[in-house]
């Protein structure tokens, strides 16, 4: 970005804005998939799909952390991880439900789909939340600025994004690659700044409104600043404890330098990431030069050694100096073992609809952090600086940075692995409920082999917990999607009767007094069309021998202590039975049977014909 052009055109730029908030934001333009800031920095944002890290085995977790360590070692100097919590986007799921309703022919199933659609809309507008995970990179110029710095920044940031994609794929995370990167960046900023408006009006509908406003004001619609499209209409910094952005109230918490635990497990940041609705987390990592940090550590160790010599064992500073010396040696040993030195900062954003709700959420967040021995401080009278720092622009305000920086090595930074989510939300799935841990919708497509290894589900619970209800709910919602469902219920089959009849299903009861039964000896021809389509023509196998083998297994389960002689007799009996049943028909053999069955019918028909003929002659 040419500095002279930006400075000389400042007066003209001030008149370009209709929204003063758009002029206040530190964003100059979005181009080439890069954000150009007003302080002449270049930033790129990528979105990451999370994984359920806490359900992985210890071995898998260790592998993920080691892969994340590899990513941190080759990442840019400044990295900003942002977790955004907002209302769940259910538009794609709703559209799929509507398409299924158009193809449904059964009236009862259509009513079921309408009720399901109302439920999805109600949950999506009030209760359900979702989380989006972003990484923001900043370009760090080497040496003095040169004329081709912009081209170097674009190349550097795109390379950093591709590298992140390769390394995070080893962790199990996928990067979302948008078709239009500039539009994606605008949509991300719109979601961050206009939380309430973005839930009602998507960015695609907001753009024509801004263009219409500029046209009505008589301004050039070809020279609209990009910040006008994602800037909120209201921004209030007049309060010391919170800010008001787009009609929502936000406050900020910092984890100070002394607020972290000395030892943490892998993925400990999931405590904050999945804290609940209205909680955003920003994690900043700043890599420091090794040679300079080794020099500073050695200098500080010498100073602390000289101080502890003058302090007695009963002095209050003795323990703190001793801990500082041990920490210094730990950091120095880690750097010697080829680990990098980072400054880590954690900023927590709390969002609510009213000041009272904001106070309640802030107190609950403090309790949650305190229960895990993590301290926090408020950003009172520095809410504006915290607001700007929470933007995904890799720019933490200096005072907040000094107040919250914590020195960590590469392994400590990797333990903050942030891409952790308990969400299970598939567009083509069925709703099972709301996750009570993080208020996310649980919409599962168990047949999606790209996400799940198989379609097996185990339902466990105490008596009265709702196992049968859940099974019935899944069956009804799978029927809504056109999936054929069979339920084998030995003891509770009657509980499924009404649901089965109301959606046009078939209720089959198998008992000694029932009209339905199962013929275990029937041979049915298997449908191999799908296998032949995939593998081509297949060798025809004997259906009789396969059936006899399965019957042997069936009878061995009924009679476990069957002897070899009995097995041989059973095999002989089965062969004779099928030989008598499956032999080719002989007319001489079946003619007596036909005469036996149809002779009385023939006599009745002849007698009836005579009666009809006699009645006709009498009428004439």
Where in the sequence are the language-model features?
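Post-Walker A helix-loop "phosphate-sensing" segment adjacent to the P-loop in P-loop NTPases
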Residues: 166, 476-486, 503-505
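Hydrophobic positions on the alpha1 helix immediately C-terminal to the Walker A/P-loop
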Residues: 470
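Extended, folded cores of ATP/NTP-driven motor/assembly subunits in large transport
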Residues: 2-419
């Amino acid at each position: 970005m040419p500095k002279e052009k930006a400075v000389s055109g400042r007066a003209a730029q001030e008149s370009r804005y209709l929204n003063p908030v758009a002029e206040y934001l530190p964003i100059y333009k979005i181009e080439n998939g890069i954000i150009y800031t007003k302080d002449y920095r270049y930033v790129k944002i990528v979105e990451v799909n999370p994984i359920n890290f806490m359900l992985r085995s210890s071995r898998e977790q260790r592998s993920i952390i080691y892969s994340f360590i590899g990513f941190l070692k080759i990442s840019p100097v400044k990295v900003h991880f942002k977790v955004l919590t907002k209302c769940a986007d259910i538009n794609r799921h709703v559209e799929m439900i509507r398409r299924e309703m158009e193809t449904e022919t059964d009236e009862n199933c259509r009513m079921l789909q309408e009720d399901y659609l109302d439920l999805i809309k109600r949950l999506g507008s009030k209760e359900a939340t979702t989380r989006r995970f972003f990484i923001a990179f900043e370009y760090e110029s080497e040496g003095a600025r040169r004329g081709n710095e912009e081209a170097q920044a674009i190349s550097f940031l795109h390379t950093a994004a591709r590298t992140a994609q390769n390394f995070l794929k080893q962790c199990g995370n996928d990067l979302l690659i948008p078709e239009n990167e500039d539009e994606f960046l605008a949509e991300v900023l719109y979601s961050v700044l206009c939380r309430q408006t973005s839930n009602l009006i998507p960015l695609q509908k907001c753009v024509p409104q801004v263009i219409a406003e500029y046209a009505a004001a008589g301004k050039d619609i070809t020279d609209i600043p990009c910040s006008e499209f994602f800037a909120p209409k209201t921004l209030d910094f007049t309060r010391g404890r919170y800010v008001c952005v787009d009609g929502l109230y936000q406050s900020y918490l910092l984890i100070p330098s002394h607020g972290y635990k000395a030892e943490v497990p892998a993925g400990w940041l999931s405590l904050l990431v999945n804290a609940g609705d209205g909680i955003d987390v920003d994690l900043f990592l700043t890599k420091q030069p090794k040679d300079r940090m080794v020099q500073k550590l050695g200098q500080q160790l010498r100073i602390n050694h000289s101080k502890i010599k003058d302090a007695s064992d009963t002095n209050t500073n003795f323990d703190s100096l001793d801990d500082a010396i041990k920490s210094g040696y730990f950091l120095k040993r880690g750097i010697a073992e080829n680990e990098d030195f980072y400054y880590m900062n954690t900023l927590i954003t709390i969002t609510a609809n009213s000041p009272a709700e904001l106070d309640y959420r802030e107190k609950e967040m403090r309790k949650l952090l305190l229960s895990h021995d993590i301290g926090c401080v408020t950003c009172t009278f520095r809410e504006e600086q915290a607001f700007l720092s929470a933007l995904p622009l890799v720019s933490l305000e200096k005072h907040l940075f000094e107040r919250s920086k914590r020195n960590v090595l590469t392994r400590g930074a990797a333990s903050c692995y942030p891409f952790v989510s308990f969400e299970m939300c598939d567009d083509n799935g069925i709703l099972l409920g709301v996750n009570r841990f993080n208020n996310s919708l649980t919409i599962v497509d168990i047949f999606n082999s790209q996400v799940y290894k198989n379609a097996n589900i185990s339902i466990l619970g105490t008596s009265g917990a709702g196992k049968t209800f859940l099974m019935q709910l899944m069956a009804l919602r799978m029927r809504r999607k056109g999936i054929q469902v069979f339920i084998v219920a030995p003891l509770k089959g009657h509980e499924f009767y009404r649901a089965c009849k109301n959606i046009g299903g078939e209720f089959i009861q198998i008992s000694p007094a029932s009209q339905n039964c199962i013929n275990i000896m029937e041979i049915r021809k298997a449908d191999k069309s799908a296998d032949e389509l995939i593998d081509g023509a297949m060798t025809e196998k004997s259906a009789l021998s396969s059936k006899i083998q399965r019957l042997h297994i069936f009878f061995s389960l009924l009679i476990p202590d069957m002897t070899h002689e009995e097995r041989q007799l059973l095999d002989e009996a089965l062969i004779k039975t099928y030989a008598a049943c499956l032999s080719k028909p002989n007319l001489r053999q079946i003619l007596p049977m036909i005469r036996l069955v149809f002779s009385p019918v023939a006599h009745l028909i002849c007698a009836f014909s005579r009666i009809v003929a006699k009645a006709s002659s009498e009428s004439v």
